[in-house]
């Protein structure tokens, strides 16, 4: 991935027309066509063009974000950012169709209307975040899923485990370009989440505008190349990692993401692990670390926001099965947003 300065732009959600009047008849024909088209949009606001986006004030649910390496401005003009309280980007991959299916069958709405209702009730916009692959068969499958559910943001970056820090930076820049949000939440596709409780957490009054929310940890730096979390830059870190959030879910306030977006990509030190990389960047900023164990609970409780099998797995072990099992528990899916006074 190139380290040159990059910006994002979204593809327009419908086609624009250009017409040069050649003769009076052509001008009248075009004018009449435009009038009829405008009238149809008033009478039939649900009309869709190319099967992609409704002609309403709602933002497109699925947007492709591309790297602009040619210039220093957004090619198609400035994108109008959709206002939300929190944007949740669920990081997913090409081998995770089963996980996405499990999420849509449990805590995440499975259709655009459900996503809209969730946004209205909680202030949260939720989308899957995925890159690209050179495997055309997998891209065909993804395009089919996009057409069916319309709940993705597509990043123009290779989807590889070794590039997760780069994908994370691309995610925050893309989310910032599309959404005017108070918090930007990075979440994995193998956790059980309560959006209603997450909404309350993000809405809490804070005295510090630069906030880093997460279940914080420290631990030894892995220096064995055979281990999954091996860190080639271990010499820069010492024997123990600094305080940083577990990777399955954390959030950055708008001011923090604004600072990330303003920096050139080659300004960032990229460590092997995405959560460590973000934690290192937070050390360079005047952020408030907010440590929340409600974001890393192993079982559903009256206060749990995110549930996953800590410390055994970095997410739910066997998430496709566990997600459904948890959702069947009343303590997970049907308990009130706020605990009762006697709990």
From Swiss-Prot:
<dbReference type="GO" id="GO:0005794">
    <property type="term" value="C:Golgi apparatus"/>
</dbReference>
<protein>
    <recommendedName>
        <fullName>Probable beta-1,3-galactosyltransferase 13</fullName>
        <ecNumber>2.4.1.-</ecNumber>
    </recommendedName>
</protein>
<keyword id="KW-0472">Membrane</keyword>
<keyword id="KW-0325">Glycoprotein</keyword>
<dbReference type="GO" id="GO:0000139">
    <property type="term" value="C:Golgi membrane"/>
</dbReference>
<comment type="function">
    <text>Beta-1,3-galactosyltransferase that transfers galactose from UDP-galactose to substrates with a terminal glycosyl residue.</text>
</comment>
<dbReference type="InterPro" id="IPR002659">
    <property type="entry name" value="Glyco_trans_31"/>
</dbReference>
<dbReference type="GO" id="GO:0016758">
    <property type="term" value="F:hexosyltransferase activity"/>
</dbReference>
<keyword id="KW-0328">Glycosyltransferase</keyword>
<dbReference type="GO" id="GO:0006486">
    <property type="term" value="P:protein glycosylation"/>
</dbReference>
<keyword id="KW-0812">Transmembrane</keyword>
<feature type="transmembrane region" description="Helical; Signal-anchor for type II membrane protein">
    <location>
        <begin position="22"/>
        <end position="42"/>
    </location>
</feature>
<comment type="similarity">
    <text>Belongs to the glycosyltransferase 31 family.</text>
</comment>
<feature type="glycosylation site" description="N-linked (GlcNAc...) asparagine">
    <location>
        <position position="265"/>
    </location>
</feature>
<keyword id="KW-0464">Manganese</keyword>
<keyword id="KW-0808">Transferase</keyword>
<dbReference type="Pfam" id="PF01762">
    <property type="entry name" value="Galactosyl_T"/>
</dbReference>
<keyword id="KW-0333">Golgi apparatus</keyword>
<keyword id="KW-0735">Signal-anchor</keyword>
<comment type="pathway">
    <text>Protein modification; protein glycosylation.</text>
</comment>
<keyword id="KW-1133">Transmembrane helix</keyword>
């Amino acid at each position: 991935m190139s380290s040159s300065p990059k910006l994002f732009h979204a593809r327009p959600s419908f086609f624009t027309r250009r017409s040069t009047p050649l003769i009076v008849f052509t001008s009248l024909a075009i004018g009449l066509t435009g009038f009829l088209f405008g009238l149809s949009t008033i009478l039939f606001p649900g009309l869709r063009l190319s099967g992609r986006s409704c002609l309403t004030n709602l933002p497109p649910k699925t947007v492709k974000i591309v790297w602009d390496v040619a210039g220093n401005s957004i090619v198609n003009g400035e994108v109008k950012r959709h206002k939300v309280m929190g944007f949740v980007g669920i990081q997913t991959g090409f081998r995770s169709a089963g996980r996405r299916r499990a999420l849509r069958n449990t805590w995440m709405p499975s259709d655009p209307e459900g996503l809209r209702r969730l946004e209205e009730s909680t202030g949260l916009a939720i989308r899957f975040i995925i890159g690209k692959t050179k495997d055309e068969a997998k891209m065909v499958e993804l395009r089919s899923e996009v057409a069916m559910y319309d709940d993705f943001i597509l990043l123009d970056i290779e989807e590889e485990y070794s590039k997760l820090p780069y994908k994370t930076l691309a995610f925050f820049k893309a989310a910032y370009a599309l959404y005017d949000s108070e918090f930007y939440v990075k979440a994995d596709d193998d956790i059980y989440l309560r959006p209603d409780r997450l909404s309350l957490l993000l809405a809490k009054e804070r005295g510090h505008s630069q906030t880093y929310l997460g279940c914080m940890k420290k631990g030894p730096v892995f220096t064995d190349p055979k281990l999954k979390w091996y860190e080639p830059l271990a010499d820069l870190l010492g024997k123990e990692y600094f305080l940083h959030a577990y990777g399955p879910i954390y959030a950055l306030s708008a001011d923090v993401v604004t600072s990330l977006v303003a920096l050139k990509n080659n300004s960032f030190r990229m460590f092997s692990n995405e959560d460590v990389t973000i934690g290192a960047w937070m050390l360079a900023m005047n952020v408030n670390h907010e440590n929340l164990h409600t974001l890393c609970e192993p079982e559903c409780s009256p206060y749990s926001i995110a549930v996953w099998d800590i410390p055994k797995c970095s997410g739910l072990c066997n998430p496709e099965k566990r997600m459904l099992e948890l959702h069947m528990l009343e303590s997970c899916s049907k308990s009130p947003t706020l605990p009762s006074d006697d709990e």
